[in-house]
Amino acid sequence: MDFFNKMFKSNSRNMETAASSDPQESNDKTDVENKEDSFFDFELPVPTRCVTVLIVGGGSRGTVYSYFAVNFPKRMKVVGVVDPRSCVKEKFKTVHDIDEDKYFDDWKEAAEMEKFAGAVVIATPDRLHKDPAVAFAKKGYHILLEKPMAVTPEDCHEIVETCKESGVMLAVGHVLRYHPSSQKIKELIDAGVIGDVVHIQHLEPVGHWHFAHSFVRGNWGKESESTFTLMSKSCHDIDLVCYWMGKNRCLKVSSFGTLSHFTKENKPKDASSRCLDCSVEETCPYSVQKIYLKYAQQGCFSWPTSVVCSNGVYDIESLTEALRTGPYGRCVYDCDNDVCSNQVVNMEFEGGRTVAFTMMGFTQALGVRSTTIYGSKGH
């Protein structure tokens, strides 16, 4: 359990806590200890059966989903895991007591076996969603598919059609739709409290250090290896505004985005290509000392530090080595990133309703969306 406690002390942080400008400021409670702040409804009756789940992709997101089984063992049990890393498979095996023949290097190995779980959580990289989703649907698994569903319309349609033909449930991990605040907004709109919706103004503040971690140094920095930022980061938000608009379909879209800061042209004159060796590290807001090492030295190895230690060893020595040699220790102005750091989207819906959305990577706050909904009777 120590592995999971280190990595996910803040799974149930509420939106106010997530506003912190520090990466791991409030990661001082485990999910079990933080039930009052959790998004789950703890008053639900105990279910009559436990859902068995196969986790495909044991990274940060796959592990977060699996942690539900740790907190609620009568509701869910992880019975298999797919991940190419031995350290990840061993941790899952230990925490979830997985049988020897139910952890795999490749999802194809699991898909070739006779069905052994009721559902599968697919948390592979963005561009690797379609093939496992189609394969497991054909085997009769119900599917929780991490967002985005896929990175092309064709792949999305194939996933949906296969699930329909196979008679299995498909849920995409647009988890913000189920947050109490999102549900309350939907409730008020449907009740006509502000009349007919005229316009939605919505901002997603990614957080400056989060953007640097995930979309400059990290896994989502190159469109060819993942997808564009609006898809990888802000599909939550596009899903929300469409959800709030109800049956009104989007008719027109215009969008502009730029990558104007995290470029080689903006690299400080005396900066090094590696952050740990850089002479301007102390004054840089993207210093790995500030984002990772500061908290690790206090014993905190939860996200985002957990992602840096890809070998599964959570100590200062392993973290320092990863920062010295791996992608997360690179200068943010000397990476191979090419995705937008800010983007605006204007949408026109049926009935003349409009939406103005902004994704901004240069904010102090992280994850605290700002939404104003204007209606015919108020806002």
Task: Tell what function each PLM region has.
Residues 325-379:
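Glycine-enriched catalytic-core subsegment of oxygenase/oxidase enzymes
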Residues 158-175, 195-199:
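Rossmann-fold dehydrogenase core element
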Residues 98-162:
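Beta-loop-alpha module in the N-terminal Rossmann-like domain of NAD(P)-dependent dehydrogenases
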Residues 80, 119, 199:
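Short, Asp-centered acidic motifs that coordinate Mg2+ and/or phosphate
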Residues 176-330:
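Predominantly a Rossmann-like dinucleotide-binding segment in NAD(P)-dependent oxidoreductases
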Residues 2-18, 22-98:
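N-terminal Rossmann-like dinucleotide-binding module
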